[in-house]
């Protein structure tokens, strides 16, 4: 059997972490087994759906490196791939269910249903539809139609039936049909509900495995009943765990960024996010946590997907992203850094080839101190400012501040005499400052760092000074002496 899986987002907003993980797991499963991955759009919520959100979702998938073999924008033999373009298909199949006695029209008002729900809950029973319109006579139907009531279409759930799901993640799960109630498959505006449309789409598109979030498990018995009523073969199911915040509550905006677009805008790298998402509920075994997409694809199986909820740990994501930042090419990182530096006011003019080469030196140093690219603006001020302002109070926080004038004077003299400043020549000059002043260790480094950078901590001086350049280094030393 050739594996066919799908990702079917609703375009009512950006692609969120949970949706991205579902898409990734489906993609990995297809690629691991040499199958096909399909993307379609579930846009029957017409008030909230938009083409802008659809484009955002598709762009987020592409950015993560998730491609698809069939579906929206790609085409294929099983389209259309938007639900709003498939309405006639659902309506025809709904009619067939009515004709076969598997569905019926319901004229109950919201008020009547609310009273019914409340009565069931007071008795400690699950709220469900009790079938008031199950066996309406033609006269009652005609009366309701004459009153202008628009019916919904309900599926007639068989009584006393055990519905068994052999789930790849959850194992065997059973539901009793008596606890489900006759559910709506077509709304009063003749638009299909999720449970009906998803069955029709999965069947028409030849989906063999449905890999989705655990929250859909309760929908599965309803969908299985529709498959059986239409005489269709059911796909296999795998319901992956929920994603929780570090406080073990369901992940939400209060836990930080929740959409892929937000992480993209903050300057996370797609390979880091994919690595992180893959580990939200899946593990290949062992202690290793850093994997390329190719490695994950080769190892991914559903039997390694955990039942327990996955915890979204932003510290772990930051650690992973920091690792990938330090592995990435400086050229790539510099291009990513430019918009953040422009936004912070560090880059105002057009960037020349010479300036870009200098920026690469800045980024090569700063990347060692950041978890995502937006943070780079917090670590580059020392390279861009013309002058360093040091108050006497700041100077007094430095070990050996009394010797600061001596160190500044010796440094100015030795840096002035240097032909060029490289990491090696700066190391030699700092050593020479020690010999000339008779000072050692922190009594040289701290005054020198504060004098040149205005900071007490940061990258090694032999890395910073060549990038600042001779002219600005001397100017800062002169300012410090004053």
UniProtKB/Swiss-Prot annotation:
Protein localization: Cytoplasm
Keywords of this entry: Aminoacyl-tRNA synthetase, ATP-binding, Cytoplasm, Ligase, Nucleotide-binding, Protein biosynthesis
Pfam family membership, one: Anticodon_2
Motif ('HIGH' region): 9-19
Chief localisation class: cytoplasm
UniProt-listed NCBIfam families: gltX_bact
Subunit structure comment from the entry: Monomer.
Name of this chain's protein: Glutamate--tRNA ligase
Organism (species): Desulforamulus reducens (strain ATCC BAA-1160 / DSM 100696 / MI-1) (Desulfotomaculum reducens)
